[in-house]
UniProtKB/Swiss-Prot annotation:
Its main location: plastid. Keywords: Chloroplast, mRNA processing, Plastid, RNA-binding, tRNA processing. One of its GO terms (molecular function) is RNA binding. GO terms for biological process: mRNA processing; RNA splicing; tRNA processing. This is Maturase K. HAMAP family: MatK. It is found in: Plastid, Chloroplast. The keyword 4Fe-4S does not apply. Belongs to the intron maturase 2 family. MatK subfamily. PANTHER family: MATURASE K (PTHR34811:SF1). It comes from the Eukaryota. One of its GO terms (cellular component) is chloroplast.
Length: 476
C-alpha cells in the first residue's frame, strides 16, 4: 500500500484529535477514516457521514466496520470479545481484513516520518527507482575497494518482530494487538507457507518486512557505519598530515610504515538493496573480511534479536572479482593507456593506468527466461509461440513489442550490447515463426511482408514515441 500526500494529511488531522499522539498509536485504530483510506475508496469531503452504506465489494461495507468499532469501544473484556469473534468466521475475516490494513497504514505512516528524520540526521541520499541502480553502480562503485554481498533471511519469528517494534513504539496496547494478529496469522498460514515472505499476494504480513524489519536494518547500518567512518577518518588522519614527524622519529615512522592502512577523508559506504538482496561497498578504506562479517552479525544479534547464518555473507575485492546483482554482473577492469610526454631532446613513453568500470551480464539468465516462456529452446534457438496464434497480427506484434522494450530498458545500461542483440534476434525470429504458423506460411514469406519493416534500434532512438512499427496493413 503506497503512502500518498492525502494519507499523510489525514494522519496529521487524526493525530491532532488524539490527546497523547506522541506516545500512543493504539487510539488511531478507532478512527473510521483509516479504513476509508486503506480501502483506496475516498468519500466526498462534503459528506463524511460514514453511517451510509458504502460498499467496498460484494461482501464488505463501511457499515459493518462501524459496527465492529462500536463493539470494540463498548467492550469491558477484550479477551472474551476476541474469543467470541473468532468463533464467527464472517466477523473474524472482516475484523482481520480491515484491522490488519489499518495496522499496516499506522506502521507505514509512522515509519515514513521516522525515515525522513533519519535521512536528515545521517545525511542519507537515497534513490528508490530500480532503473537508477545501473547508473548508481557505474558512478559510485568504480572507486570502491571491497564488496559485501548479503542475503537477508526470508523468515522471522513473531516475537523477534515484536522486539523490533518495541525499539521504536512504546505503546503497549498497540504492541499486544500486533502480537495477537501476528501469531494468529502465523497459525492460519502454516500450511500455505506464506509466513513473512516477499510474496506480493501476502499483503497482510509483508508490512512487517517492508516497513519495519528492513527499515530497522538499514537504520542501524547507515547510522552506525556512518559513525564508524567518521571516527576512522579522524583517528587515522595523523598518518596523512604529520609526514615530518614520521621522518624525524624512526620508531614512529617504522610503526606507521608497518600499518598499510591509508584512509581518505571522503571515505564512505554505498548501499544498494532489492528485496532481500543487498550490496555494500566501501570507498576510501580497506576493511578486513572477518571484520565485515563480525560487525554485521553483532548488529543482527544485539539490535535485531536475530541470528543469521554466515554463509549468507560473501566479501569480494572489487578490483579482482565481480558480483551479481539484479541480472547484472558488475566488474571493474584497468585499461592500460600509453601517454607520451613532449620534449625537445627526447620523447620518453610513460605508461599510466586508467580505471574503467565494466558492466557485463551472462547470457544464460535471459535465455533461461525466454526458454521458460516459450520463445526459444534451451540452446537459444527461436521457436514459435503457439499460444499466441489465435490472436490478431497487431496483438502478436504488440506483445513482442512490449517484451523487447522491457528487455531494452532493463539491460540498456550495458556497455557491451551483445546480450541485447541476442535477445533481439530471438524475439524477431520467434515473432516471424509465430506469424508464419498462424498464416500457415513460411518464415521467409512472413519476413518479407511484415517483419522486414521492423527497425528496433531506430525506433528506440525516438524520444517522444517508443512505439515500434511492427505491423503495416492487415494480412488475412
Amino acid at each position: 500500500m503506497k503512502i500518498t500526500d492525502k494519507k499523510l494529511l489525514l494522519f496529521e488531522n487524526i493525530s491532532k484529535k488524539v490527546t497523547y499522539q506522541q506516545r500512543f498509536l493504539y487510539p488511531l485504530l478507532f478512527h473510521k477514516e483509516f479504513y476509508v483510506v486503506t480501502s483506496d475508496s475516498f468519500i466526498d469531503k462534503s459528506n463524511m457521514n460514514l453511517s451510509k452504506e458504502f460498499v467496498l465489494n460484494d461482501r464488505y461495507s463501511f457499515l459493518v466496520i462501524r459496527r465492529l468499532i462500536n463493539r470494540i469501544r463498548n467492550l469491558n473484556n477484550s479477551k472474551k470479545f476476541i474469543q467470541t469473534s473468532l468463533s464467527d468466521k464472517s466477523i473474524c475475516s472482516k475484523l482481520d481484513f480491515y484491522l490488519l490494513k489499518a495496522l499496516n497504514m499506522v506502521l507505514e505512516t509512522f515509519l515514513l516520518i521516522q525515515s525522513e528524520q533519519t535521512k536528515k540526521r545521517v545525511n542519507w541520499k537515497s534513490y528508490k527507482s530500480i532503473f537508477s541502480t545501473c547508473s548508481f553502480v557505474e558512478e559510485k562503485f568504480i572507486f570502491s575497494n571491497q564488496i559485501l554481498d548479503l542475503k537477508i533471511p526470508h523468515f522471522i519469528h513473531p516475537e523477534s518482530f515484536i522486539r523490533i517494534l518495541r525499539q521504536q513504539i512504546k505503546d503497549a496496547s498497540f504492541l499486544h494487538l500486533t502480537r495477537f494478529f501476528v501469531h494468529e496469522y502465523k497459525e492460519r498460514s502454516k500450511n500455505e507457507k506464506l509466513i513473512y515472505s516477499f510474496n506480493k499476494r501476502n499483503k497482510f504480513v509483508t508490512f512487517s518486512w517492508n516497513f519495519f524489519y528492513i527499515f530497522e536494518l538499514e537504520f542501524f547500518l547507515t547510522s552506525l557505519l556512518t559513525r564508524f567512518i567518521n571516527n576512522l577518518v579522524l583517528s587515522n588522519l595523523f598518518d596523512q598530515i604529520n609526514l615530518l614527524e614520521k621522518i624525524n622519529n624512526n620508531n614512529k615512522s617504522q610503526f606507521f610504515l608497518s600499518e598499510k592502512r591509508i584512509y581518505n577523508q571522503n571515505s564512505c559506504i554505498h548501499y544498494v538493496r532489492y528485496q532481500n538482496h543487498c550490496i555494500m561497498a566501501s570507498e576510501g578504506f580497506y576493511f578486513h573480511d572477518t571484520n565485515w562479517i563480525y560487525y554485521i552479525l553483532n548488529i543482527w544479534q544485539f539490535f535485531m534479536h536475530l541470528w543469521i547464518q554466515p554463509f549468507r555473507f560473501s566479501t569480494k575485492h572489487f578490483q579482482k572479482q565481480s558480483f551479481f546483482f539484479l541480472g547484472y554482473q558488475f566488474g571493474r577492469e584497468s585499461k592500460l593507456l600509453k601517454v607520451r610526454s613532449i620534449s625537445l631532446d627526447k620523447s620518453p613513453t610513460i605508461y599510466s593506468r586508467l580505471k574503467k568500470n565494466l558492466l557485463k551480464t551472462q547470457i544464460v539468465y535471459p535465455i533461461d527466461f525466454l526458454a521458460k516462456e516459450g520463445f526459444c529452446d534451451i540452446s537459444g534457438y527461436p521457436i514459435s509461440r503457439s499460444t499466441w496464434t489465435t490472436s490478431t497480427d497487431e496483438e502478436i506484434l504488440l506483445n513482442f513489442n512490449k517484451i523487447w522494450k522491457s528487455f531494452y530498458f532493463y539491460y540498456g545500461g550495458l556497455i557491451k550490447k551483445d546480450i541485447l542483440y541476442r535477445i533481439k534476434y530471438i524475439l524477431r525470429f520467434s515473432c516471424a515463426k509465430t506469424l508464419a504458423r498462424k498464416h500457415k506460411s513460411t518464415t521467409r514469406v512472413v519476413w518479407k511482408k511484415i517483419v522486414s519493416d521492423l527497425s528496433l534500434s531506430s525506433s528506440l532512438r525516438r524520444k517522444k514515441n517508443f512505439h515500434f512499427v511492427f505491423f503495416q496493413g492487415s494480412h488475412g
